[in-house]
Every structure is written in structure tokens, then in C-alpha cells.
């Protein structure tokens, strides 16, 4: 395992630990999720270029588009929560409420 792969896996695991530890605020959770997606994007790009699987060259771009949509949805939820409640506590989310 090269040092680049080790650093990327460490970045992913640190972002995952951040999601699990700092889940009280939505903004910190969204930042950790974005870090996870970016490390996955870089790992997927390196994997495709290392094994010369150029038939999968669109996969990192699709992952990047999905992560951008996820970030936009998360920011929209953050703005809606801050307008309604005045804070970004995840405990204010009630998924059963319309």
C-alpha cells in the first residue's frame, strides 16, 4: 500500500469519525460528509488510472455530480432549519413531520 492510498484512507476514516462524533450540528456533519466524498473521488480516480480501466473513466465524474447534489440538498436543509429554528442542531429534524 502506497503512502498516497494510506493518506486517502486515513482522510476517509477521519471524516467518518467526524460524522459519528460531531453529529449534533448539521454544518459539521455536512463538512465531514463532503470530506468523505472528496476522498472517495480521489481514491476512485487513482484506482482507475492505476489499473488502466479507462472504460470506467466516467465514474469519478458521476460521483462528483452526486456529491454536488448532496451538498446542495444539505445546504438547502441547513438554510431551512436556520430560518425555522435559528440553529443547526440535528435534533430539531423530525423526519415524520411534513
UniProtKB/Swiss-Prot annotation:
Enzyme category, top tier: translocase
Membrane topology: Multi-pass membrane protein
Entry GO terms, CC: mitochondrial inner membrane; respiratory chain complex I
Transmembrane segments annotated in the record for this chain: 1-21, 28-48, 59-79
Source organism superkingdom: Eukaryota
InterPro entries: NADH_UbQ_OxRdtase_chain4L/K, NUOK/Mnh_C1-like
Predominant location: mitochondrion
EC number(s) per entry: 7.1.1.2
GO biological process terms, semicolon-separated: ATP synthesis coupled electron transport
GO terms, molecular function: NADH dehydrogenase (ubiquinone) activity
Subcellular location: Mitochondrion inner membrane
Keywords: Electron transport, Membrane, Mitochondrion, Mitochondrion inner membrane, NAD, Respiratory chain, Translocase, Transmembrane, Transmembrane helix, Transport, Ubiquinone
Reaction equation(s) it catalyzes: a ubiquinone + NADH + 5 H(+)(in) = a ubiquinol + NAD(+) + 4 H(+)(out)
Job of this protein: Core subunit of the mitochondrial membrane respiratory chain NADH dehydrogenase (Complex I) which catalyzes electron transfer from NADH through the respiratory chain, using ubiquinone as an electron acceptor. Part of the enzyme membrane arm which is embedded in the lipid bilayer and involved in proton translocation.
Family to which this protein belongs: Belongs to the complex I subunit 4L family.
The protein's assembly and partners: Core subunit of respiratory chain NADH dehydrogenase (Complex I) which is composed of 45 different subunits.
Protein name (database record): NADH-ubiquinone oxidoreductase chain 4L
Organism: Phascolarctos cinereus (Koala)
Gene (name only): MT-ND4L
